[in-house]
Amino acid sequence: MREKPMEERENGVRTAHLTGALPMSEMLEMYVDVEKFLGYCAACPRCGRMWSCPPYDFDPEEVWLRYAAVTLYAVQVFPESGAAKAAALADPEMFLRPYRRALDTLLEERERETPGSLRLDAGRCLVCERCARRDAQPCRFPEKLRYSLESLGANVGALVADKLGAPLQWGTKDAPPEYFVLVGAVLTKGE
């Protein structure tokens, strides 16, 4: 199920908010391959350096199996002005940070509204400036720590293309993509 996107424009950037839902059985069958996608995580410099990134002391597949349904929440970010494109090209993570924080806030609200649910954020944990895992220390805020779809083995590229109609795009060294997609989810016990 996919809802019609809501669009906004501000400071040379257009955003579209997307939502979709699917049963966990479909998610597991079509979009989760823990071994494959955690293998990609192993190539990332953040792997083993953040508590929101693998390797974990739990089986990610077990997380999925505790829930019955997945609701996706995403924001497409279109840098349209010259200044927005330059900012997106210079430092994509910083350019996207306010959109990421807004999406994480929405996910937090949805999780709070739905007892027994679990939110998956749009990427790595942003709670601490420097993750305690880098210093071989336990997470300082375990109640705030959330994982991402991809860190638990989800194929985010296929998921957003199929369920939200927003295939991932890649920029070049000279130009950002037409749009970025930030996607998170809320896993729920009931269909």
Language-model features: locations:
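Amphipathic alpha-helical segments
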Residues: 9-14
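N-terminal amphipathic/basic-hydrophobic helices that include classical n-h-c signal peptides
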Residues: 1-6
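Catalytic cores of enzyme domains
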Residues: 15-191
